[in-house]
């Protein structure tokens, strides 16, 4: 467990050292999971390089043990860094934290208790991260809970955006163009990945159980949807298994498009 905690803390500390550097001309923001929508995972900065890497020291640590019922054991998240603030999903409840990038001070924390629905999630724990959106005035943090809810937060306060969805939340198991086996509480669908924000559209995929271990072929179809970033209104849906009359339906022989599932887009969309 110590190794997992240190991994999160060291990554944050290294970001903190870069943000604290006297050179402020370089863009050290990391505003999306992959740095940018192209998925480059690259920033052209040289404040940390081969000549000084061995001189880095831990500036601060932040432990996530108390954000959930037990310590995290499978850390996969990538924090975002925007204007000197670090945003990350954290803990077994998949809360969201905002930290001062220089000092590590906790600025705010947000989490939702999802009860049985969260416990039954096929994609539990802290997940791979979250997304950031701004129009130059408003700044929002967007993430998907273990129970498959899309949440919009004020980046400055961590409070839910009341005008988004229903009190800042969209139930992704609803308006999904299918009936979920197991219903809202135990229906097998979730998401580890961060939602992708393209312009003013939030793109959300779907995932089933990890490790190619579906209980049945007749399972949830992992459709992809786009939502308006301001209101949460569903803008479009892509059926990964085509419906009757749609392109590709006839290639699913013997009516298999009606019964087959497990076709999620679980990875990070770019």
Role assignments for model-derived ranges:
Residues 153, 158, 219-233:
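Beta-propeller blade signature
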Residues 1-6:
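N-terminal secretory signal peptides that target proteins for export/translocation
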Residues 26-70, 105-119, 159-184, 233-240, ...:
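Aromatic (tryptophan-biased) beta-strands that constitute blades/sheets of beta-rich domains
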Residues 9-20:
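Bacterial N-terminal signal peptides
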Residues 50-53, 84, 101, 135, ...:
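Inter-blade boundary loops/turns of WD-repeat beta-propellers
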Residues 21-25:
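Sec/Tat signal peptide C-region and signal peptidase I cleavage site
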Residues 31, 46, 97, 151, ...:
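Conserved hydrophobic/aromatic positions in well-ordered beta-strands
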Residues 30-34, 72-91, 95, 121-149, ...:
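Repeat-blade elements of multi-bladed beta-propeller folds
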